[in-house]
Amino acid sequence: MTTLRLLISDSYDPWFNLAVEECIFRQMPATQRVLFLWRNADTVVIGRAQNPWKECNTRRMEEDNVRLARRSSGGGAVFHDLGNTCFTFMAGKPEYDKTISTAIVLNALNALGVTAEASGRNDLVVKTPEGDRKVSGSAYRETKDRGFHHGTLLLNADLSRLANYLNPDKKKLQAKGIASVRGRVANLVELLPGITHEHICDAITEAFFSHYGERVEAEIISPDKTPDLPNFAETFARQSSWEWNFGQAPAFTHLLDERFIWGGVELHFDVEKGHITRTQVFTDSLNPAPLEALAGRLQGCLYRADMLQQECDALLVDFPEQEKELRELSAWIARAVR
């Protein structure tokens, strides 16, 4: 009986793919070696301990329908589109060894005609006249009895979009999250014109089989049919939830300030697990009462634009004379936290 398992996703949904990865990892036998191949449509994927408001231009992501997905491994933020090929290697301990999976990817690239090498803890680079350029980044996760190594290969990614979503707005954030390290990157298509996702997947699969001396039929994972994986529905619900993708951010402080015709406003938010734990308001408005009331209402509120706007709008009942000012305030806060 083979000890290998090969899964290929035909979904471009990052929440679906990460839920599949999580379910396989949890339920795989300790003796199994798994290769999972997948890719995501426009998505920013952040590390387990990162703060999306710090790492990402969340406002532009919303405008461009770019999803946010938090993975269960550490590391930094990356932008995925269909020009990325994603891979995950899993194994039980003591079999799990990320140097083996790294070697498999390097062997796959070599078979395609690309000479790459490992650089630092997480990257694969190619030599060019301009210097080393990164073609792959990885992250890792280990539990007591198993581990996985997942990463991306830049195939034909739209590199111009990296800066659109990974360079955050100049927000006044003081956060404990891990800042992403930006590096010089290259697409494999620059080195191998005409290379496709299927070529990469075939090469990694062959290198995987060659290393272990076994072969196995691929299992195609599709969103058209719920995967036969234990607790998949619950895992997908969690992976796609605001509470996981945003609410798991490390504690941080966000300072907003704006000058309106009716006065200047400074808001200091302390946020933990996606909820506001404290709001301080400073203003030179002649009528600070609505703002003072807002500070009280926001205690415990989800740090989400629609929820903050809802609390601002609720003040209209108690302060109808300040409707114009409150609507301006509401719109500004919603824009600022997106």
UniProtKB/Swiss-Prot annotation:
Keywords: ATP-binding, Cytoplasm, Ligase, Nucleotide-binding
Binding-site residues, ATP: 71, 76-79, 134
Sites where the protein binds (R)-lipoate: 134
One function term, GO molecular function aspect: ATP binding
Pfam families named among the record's database cross-references: Lip_prot_lig_C, LplA-B_cat
Family membership: Belongs to the LplA family.
Listed PANTHER family: LIPOATE-PROTEIN LIGASE, LIPOYLTRANSFERASE 1, MITOCHONDRIAL
Its biological purpose: Catalyzes both the ATP-dependent activation of exogenously supplied lipoate to lipoyl-AMP and the transfer of the activated lipoyl onto the lipoyl domains of lipoate-dependent enzymes.
UniProt name for this protein: Lipoate-protein ligase A
Lineage: Bacteria, Pseudomonadati, Pseudomonadota, Gammaproteobacteria, Enterobacterales
